[in-house]
Amino acid sequence: MDFGDLLRYAKKNSDAVTKEVGQGKYYSTKYSPPKKQSKESKQLSSNIQKFLQKKEAEEAEKKRLERQKLNDLLAKRDEKSKNKIRKMLKVTKSANKSVLEDAKDYEGAIDGHEAGEGQGDDYGYVSTEANAFYDKYIEKVRDVQEDKGFTPSRPQSLKDLSGTKERVKAAITREREEAKGNTRQKSSTSTLPSSATKSKESSVARSYSTSKTLYDPNAEKLEEERKKRQEEEQRRAKIKRPAQPPPMDFQALLRLAEKKQHEPVVFEVEKKKEPERLLSAREKRELEERQRQQEQRAQRLKMRESEGKETPKSIPNRMEPNGRIPKLNQAKPANAPSDSFKKPTAPQPTKSSASSTSLSSSNSHSSASRSSVSSSRPATKSAQLTARPGATASAVGKPSSSSSRDVPSKNPYAATSLKGTVREFPPRDQSSISTLDRRKIPAAAKTRQTPSSDVQRSQGGRQFPPADVKRRKPNEPPVTKRRIYDDDDEDEYDSELDDFIDDGDCEEDISSHIRDIFGYDKRRYQGIDDDDRGMESSFAQVQREEFISKKLGMQEDLEDMRMEAAHKKQKKLVAKISSRS
């Protein structure tokens, strides 16, 4: 086969391939759109057509009947009501036929409305004045061009592009320098290149700054990050760590090892804490109550200590030589001569003095139930004047504390009256002075009689003191009075109750003793709260129960009514039978 035959054979094959291209089997790479299926209009059957015609005829008949009914009603309307309606239509000019006709003929029927269709408002009514205003406004607005709210974005010039390039380059160089600075430790010399870069950045910024600055969010973000880093560096520089001791050398370590080698190694075994049982609501409340009581107790102790430090020791006021009771607010009297106290006073065994002692003792009993403020009243002051022959001499000039308070009383005389011990007046050592010395005492130094003779004369035959204020016999039990409730009593602290509750850690395991004695181990029981879940109910359950109870009540009422009716019926029957007989 020569070359010419070969070419002919190749051409023949190529022609055969080109002929079979349309018929050959292959996967097409081009996707043709889906063919639209044209729906053929289906011919309705004759029965359906008849049914539709019948339905249309029925609807037309229905409309005709409605129209006829309306006409009949309008015909039945009297002339008076028709006139009213016409007048109303003239006033409102709405749905008036004449107006609608004008609207049809109006030349300016615009916006594609058909003739007879209402244009605007009021059902087709057109005002000539309104149309004139509208035309005037349209002519004015027609020439006004639309003002766009935003200016069109101007195309970036070559200058702006160069600026952005420079900015990106500066940001990349800054990031590289920061990365290098973070890897190696920053020294004092490293501040120089950073300042150089800053100056470089500023020069770059000046080079690309245009007449109109463009907002760049990326540059703003980078600036914020840079500021944050600077603040962080400044904060770290401020925090100075304390100088640590130099590390131990090898010789020091060997010496320490020689010292420690003979010491026994102590391993501290940590105590395993057993998981505690969770508290119930009641136990939690009790625990909170105990903690609150402990806090209050601690506060009271602190207050008491501070009061003890602040209040100065009260100096007991001694009696004046003439026997007069010193006033609390009076200035301190001048120092009397020391021998003036040694002058005795004559005892007054009169009836009036005895009565005054009984009055003072009753006053002292009544003042014991009052507060420390009321103890400074004159009623209690008179109690210290009176003589008590059975009192001991050791009580002279010693103020006793009122109740269990450690705070010293301001008035020592009131304190002695509260205790019940009244110091003797005159003292025992002075009562032994001879009668010869008593005669020498001047009249001015003698104590005044209480109550005075002129007061006794004015009282006449009246009993003094009254019967209810008389002194009780010593063997009689004290009268129990109802104590007035005072809020201050709650804050009072009783020292006897200090040891009642032991809040300290107890070394003994009390629960183990209880376990041995009673054979009770609380670990075997679950800590279940005693609250009854069945007692709690939701709103729906309450409503359901109310509905059931209401239903039952109604049934019971109906049953009672039925029973009453039956009872009445039976009574009537009995009455009828009795009347017949």
Swiss-Prot record:
Acidic residues bias (residue ranges): 486-495
Biased composition, class Basic and acidic residues, residue ranges: 162-181, 218-236, 256-312
Keywords: Coiled coil
The UniProt record lists the keyword 4Fe-4S: no
Chain intervals for the UniProt region annotation (Disordered): 26-50, 145-495
Entry protein name: Protein SPT2 homolog
Family to which the UniProt record says this protein belongs: Belongs to the SPT2 family.
Domain of life: Eukaryota
InterPro entries from the UniProt entry: Chromatin_SPT2, SPT2_N
Residue stretches in coiled coil: 36-76, 276-307
Gene Ontology MF terms in the entry: DNA binding; histone binding
Biased composition (Polar residues): 182-197, 204-213, 447-461
One Pfam family this sequence matches: SPT2
Residue stretches of biased makeup (Low complexity): 26-35, 352-376
Record has 4Fe-4S as a keyword: no
Any one cellular-component term (Gene Ontology): nucleolus
GO annotation, biological process: nucleosome assembly; transcription by RNA polymerase I
